[in-house]
């Protein structure tokens, strides 16, 4: 997951 987009 991305730090700024939890759904990545």
UniProtKB/Swiss-Prot annotation:
List S-S links within the chain: 2-8
Give the note.
Exists in two forms, due to cis-trans isomerization at 2-Cys-hydroxyPro-3. The cis conformation is the major form.
Any one GO CC term of the record? extracellular region
The answer to whether UniProt assigns keyword Transit peptide to this entry is: no
Per the record, residues carrying D-tryptophan are: 4
Q: Provide the function of this protein.
A: Its target is unknown, but this toxin may modulate voltage-activated calcium channels (Cav) or calcium-dependent potassium channels (KCa).
Name of the protein: Contryphan-Le
Give the subcellular location.
Secreted
Q: Which UniProt keywords apply?
A: Amidation, D-amino acid, Disulfide bond, Hydroxylation, Ion channel impairing toxin, Neurotoxin, Secreted, Toxin
> What protein family is recorded?
Belongs to the O2 superfamily. Contryphan family.
Q: In the record, which positions carry Cysteine amide? A: 8
Q: In which tissues is it expressed?
A: Expressed by the venom duct.
Domain notes for this protein: The cysteine framework is C-C.
